């Protein structure tokens, strides 16, 4: 098996990490050291993390994407249609950099908050389907209805939590739990 075949079978999946590994090869860093590093490498949670597939729709937890730039990279990394679960905010967030990417990749936006005005206004001309959800369970349920075969559902908030003490890990876990609930219902 060639080095690049071994690399493609490794746990490194994001383009930036692959580029780093390939650079190591170009710089002639010992293969054994690279293999050891790859085997020790753990995927950080809530960063474009695959959750499950339900009825040919893949679900990803990107709760760590608490700004427009991070969400942009999530959209940029896929070619499949996206059902995007995002959070509204009282902050005056500038979504300009995300508009074109959303227009190209996002088929539906589900706004998770009661502070969605800025979010909805920003994307009303870029995304045809925009919905409001009162909580994560409702957002994931709506996403499971809107999504079709080969779509992906991504929770990528694009802003910090409006709840003062809520972490991205907590929001990501809420998403994962809601997805698992849908999955359990699907298998009954």
Which ranges hold each PLM region?
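ATP-dependent carboxylate-amine ligase
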Residues: 22-30, 36, 40-46, 50-188
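Internal glycine-rich flexible loops
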Residues: 6, 17, 31-32, 38
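Glycine-rich phosphate/diphosphate-binding loops and the adjacent beta-loop-alpha structural elements
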Residues: 6-8, 18-26
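Short, conserved micro-motifs enriched in small and acidic residues
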Residues: 10-15, 65
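A short glycine-threonine-serine/GTX helix/turn-capping micro-motif
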Residues: 2-12
């Amino acid at each position: 098996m060639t080095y690049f075949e071994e690399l493609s079978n490794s746990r490194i999946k994001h383009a930036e990490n692959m580029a780093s590994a390939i650079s190591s090869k170009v710089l002639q860093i010992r293969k054994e050291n690279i293999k050891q590093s790859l085997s020790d490498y753990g995927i950080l949670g809530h960063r474009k993390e695959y959750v499950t597939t339900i009825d040919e729709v893949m679900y990803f937890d990107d709760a760590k994407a608490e700004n427009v730039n991070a969400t942009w990279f999530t959209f940029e990394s896929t070619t499949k249609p996206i059902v995007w679960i995002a959070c509204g905010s009282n902050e005056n967030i500038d979504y300009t950099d995300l508009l074109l990417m959303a227009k190209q990749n996002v088929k539906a936006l589900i706004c998770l908050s009661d502070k969605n005005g800025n979010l909805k206004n920003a994307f009303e001309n870029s995304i045809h389907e925009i919905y409001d959800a009162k909580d994560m369970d409702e957002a994931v349920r709506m996403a499971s209805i809107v999504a079709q075969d080969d779509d992906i559902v991504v929770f990528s908030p694009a802003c910090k939590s409006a709840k003062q003490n809520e972490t991205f890990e907590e929001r990501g876990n809420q998403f994962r739990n809601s997805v698992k609930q849908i999955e359990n219902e699907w298998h009954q």
